[in-house]
């Protein structure tokens, strides 16, 4: 009986020494854009940038609400697409997105979620908000205290003709390599 207690205590002590660090700081950034397809029809695009050192990403859910009243118009669910490794590697042979044993300590994945949305059920609501939120914002984002990640976009569906949202021309991932020129437009 005494040997059993010693064994249990030994297992608990050794188990507490072999702890693993869980990182939930995977959200690096995001964009929500849309393309007008026709009357009340928009192709919604949500692009998410994930730190490969953090936890895996799941599917996306985008609530669409009337901006003036807060009333829900629809909820768009989109399955997780395959990621694209967009890590600038500075000549390294691998990234953290490929393997956790890579000597290069960084990795950035881009996920592009797209869905055709018809907003005819919005009625007289002209200004529509699309949003996305997820736990947890990356610790390298220093513009606010650590917490959840949130982004939204405002679309005026009553403008004729309908319009596309602005979009960025350069990818937002920037790792500046020592001794190499860097241009960010």
List PLM regions with ranges.
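Long, compositionally biased, intrinsically disordered segments
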Residues: 22-185
